[in-house]
Amino acid sequence: MPESSIVVRPEPGGAPSNRLQAAGLAHATGVFAQLAATVPLPAAPRPIVVADYGAATGYNSLLPIGAAIAAFRRRTRTDHAVLVVHTDLPDNDFTALFTTLADDPDSYARKDTASFPSAIGRSFYSQILPSQSVNLGWTSWSTMWLRRPAGELPEFADHVHVEHSDDDTARRVYTRQAAQDWHDFVAFRGRELSPGGKLLVLTAAVDAAGRSGYGPLLDAIVAVLDEQVRDGALTRDEVARMSIPVLGRSEKELRAPFAPAGRFESLTIERLEVFDAEDRFWDRYLLDGDAVALGTHWAAFVSAAVFPTLASALAGGTDDPRAADFVRHLEAGVAARLASNPQQVQIPLALIVLAKQR
């Protein structure tokens, strides 16, 4: 399954203000800059090491890392090297990542000549950097993907998201997998962080009532899939295999690896917030009343984020000749349904800061 940040590309024009509209990103960037202002730094010539876990194309991490480097520069010489390590799975599009770093006007590599980008193509559910080497870490919209692909998890035929399923067995398996994944992710970061180092995690959460959000989107997806079955474009077995292996975690679940002593792999939770992020598409709709644009924007986002995963459940997998049409028709159908019944989308997020003891 992906370990990549769910990318929210800037809109045409690429202004930083547009990029910061990605849910929760502006707040997390501010917190990350605060961490960079206080985290212990190595003496030159040893580089300051920043890790970007689940980098994807780099779009979501450019501004946070740039803000951190700016904070470093208020504490160091301008020639003190900053080594930025972007990590993702081997099949990530690293060409797109390095193109972003070279060409994007928000790229830290364009703004700071003593910053040096690099990449590692390995799963972050193992140790991927030397022990005690990372001074500051960032990950956003990545750790909510389950490690195991949907095809290796129990099928549930009544929904595309397990939290909306009545299949108790499937729900238990997904929950156990999410717990194990979080445990392992935290454990290996505890080894990699240097003494006093810190890691910021921005990830999907559930609210106080246990709701994971995104209700209008998920309802629209299920409705359009049912239509495609009735029209003969999909089989019921194919739809039964379609699931989104993303799980939000509660505050209790996020704290679980640290129980009961409050420490795990020399890490403590310095900060934990669970909040509903802004729905920027809804905010725009309230201003312009354009329901078609609301549906189109949300459908495009969810199409890029999860429709390829759903398409992998087709009889021919990702190579199925219907795959492109499937994604196109699903996106159009979701857009139409959202436009016909405009609703705000709840986006529960968690921001966690983990600190390594000195």
PLM regions and their residue ranges:
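Short, conserved SAM-binding segment of the class I
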Residues: 132, 181-188, 192, 257
